[in-house]
């Protein structure tokens, strides 16, 4: 752990020598090359204009009718949208300040969990049920997730059951809390079963079910890997630093897919408007191997920049997305408010030669 801490400190100091005030053109020039793809669709803008508002997407795939799949996206100033793949916002539920979002299918339906930061001193998890036929969200209540301001959230599908969810709550101060959520007749209850701690601000997280690993993005430092099981050690390993080459701070959204018998981790390299794809080695202490980088360039729809949240899911999503769907928040959607861009996984896979 001393070696990891030293590496983290070195990265932090390096970041201090290269502030975000450096022009983005310079950051792009200094980073490793990235191939380009274009969006095949985009969502309607979030309702909050002239602000950093759109934040994080989650995808629900309709196996019976893939083209009828849905995207849940947060307006972190106001609530959650439900989008269809044509980009239209079919429903909005006011929820105030909600940052990240994730979802899972259970016996109780499609459960949506969002990080709720309406109280910056006491984080909460806001729970909803997604009705895919009506394309609506119904509030199921909130559960306390401990002191601090809520930022990231990810569900551990491999450790969740029909009546219980395991989630990781990423708190702005660097705390990562592993929480068991139970759905009762009077609303959800939460029990914190493990707490990890990183030194500075975090947000994005994702669980790899194959290796039972939790990945957490420390924005100015890099991606950390922890064992996901509740009884595992609370120490992690820095496996992908924000070195200005493979990733440029901030590291923001994280997403994971399994394809061809391997796991791929995708990270938003916010500082150079790119996305980095890593392999996930069996050795939990090994650096993540870089598989490639890509950007979403302007085409029929605009480019993306300064992306916060991302999500990717493989499978058939209809004729435009036959191999899978990648959704990315767009931090600059001028002259309109921020939104989410939709890209086919086939195009990303082909461009990177995966």
Where do the model's predicted regions map?
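Sequence/structural signature of beta-propeller domains
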Residues: 17-354
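Bacterial N-terminal signal peptides
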Residues: 8-15
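Sec-dependent signal peptide recognition
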Residues: 2-8
């Amino acid at each position: 752990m001393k070696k990891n801490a030293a590496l983290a400190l070195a990265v932090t100091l390096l970041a201090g020598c290269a502030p975000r005030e450096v022009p983005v053109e310079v950051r792009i020039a200094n980073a490793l090359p990235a191939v380009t793809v274009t969006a095949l669709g985009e969502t309607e803008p979030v309702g909050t204009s002239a602000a950093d508002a759109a934040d994080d997407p989650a995808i629900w795939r309709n196996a019976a009718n893939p083209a009828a799949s849905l995207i849940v996206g947060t307006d972190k100033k106001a609530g959650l949208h439900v989008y269809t793949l044509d980009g239209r916002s079919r429903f909005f539920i006011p929820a105030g300040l909600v940052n990240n979002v994730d979802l899972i299918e259970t016996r109780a339906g499609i459960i949506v969990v969002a990080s709720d930061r309406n109280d910056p001193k006491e984080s909460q998890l806001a729970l909803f049920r997604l009705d895919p036929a009506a394309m609506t969200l119904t509030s199921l209540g909130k559960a306390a997730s401990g002191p601090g301001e809520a930022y990231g959230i990810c569900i551990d599908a491999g450790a969740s059951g029909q009546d219980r969810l395991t989630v990781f709550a990423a708190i702005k101060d660097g705390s990562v809390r592993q929480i068991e959520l139970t759905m009762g007749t009077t609303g959800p209850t939460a029990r914190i079963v493990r707490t990890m701690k990183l030194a500075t601000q975090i947000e994005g997280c994702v669980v790899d079910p194959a290796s039972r690993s939790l990945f957490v993005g420390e924005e100015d430092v890099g991606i950390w890997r922890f064992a996901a099981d509740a009884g595992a050690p609370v120490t992690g390993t820095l496996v992908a630093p924000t070195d200005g080459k493979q990733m440029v701070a901030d590291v923001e959204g994280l997403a994971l897919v399994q394809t061809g018998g391997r796991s791929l981790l995708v990270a938003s390299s916010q500082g150079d408007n790119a996305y980095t794809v890593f392999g996930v080695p069996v050795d939990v202490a090994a650096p993540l191997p870089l598989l490639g980088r890509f950007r979403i360039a302007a085409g029929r729809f605009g480019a993306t920049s300064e992306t916060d949240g991302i999500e990717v899911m493989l499978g058939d999503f209809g004729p435009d997305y036959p191999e899978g769907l990648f959704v990315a928040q767009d931090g600059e959607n001028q002259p309109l408010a921020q939104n989410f861009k939709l890209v086919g996984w086939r195009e990303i896979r082909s461009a990177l030669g995966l």
